[in-house]
Amino acid sequence: MRFFVSGMPGVGKTTLAKRIADEIRREGYKVGGIITQEIRTGPKRSGFRVIALDTGEIGRLAYVGQGYPRVGRYVVDIEGFDRVAIPAISRALRDADIIIIDEIGPMEFKSNEFLKALGLVLKSEKPLLATVHRKLVDRYRPLGRYYWLTPENRNEVFAEILMEIRKVLGRNENAGNKA
């Protein structure tokens, strides 16, 4: 089962992915993949980092500065991203009960290795929760269950995705810890 979540910037896509990861992990399942977080310098966003969900390893995805490749005002650090994201996704394919990819977006698409790894994830039978940049929605909507996240529906979407993931992993919503 694949779940794709999109929405406007700042609506809570990454927060939803982290909440799902934390809840599933608390229930005894192995969660793998990546989360992308903003880097802020004071009140201004100055870049993005990628974090491996299984190890906590951090790499730089993008920063404000000079260089290429670019997405808007950001320079994409393909090497920094690949150093963390590709092994994390590979480990998730091998070891995790569920794969989380936050985000499938224009910055990540600058990495050919990411595109290959994403292709393997999409071919696998492992449950997937992925956040998708709003400009790429049409490409991924047909591949699984799709949600457009808003401030009004984010708690409902969280509960629904969590319930469905529990079903896929052999749980019901009232299940206790896996032991």
Curated annotation (Swiss-Prot):
SS bonds (residue pairs): none
Gene Ontology terms, MF aspect: ATP binding; ATP hydrolysis activity
Record flagged with keyword Hydrolase: yes
EC number: 3.6.1.15
Binding site for ATP: 7-14, 98-105
Keyword field: ATP-binding, Hydrolase, Nucleotide-binding
Assigned protein family: Belongs to the THEP1 NTPase family.
Protein name as catalogued: Nucleoside-triphosphatase THEP1
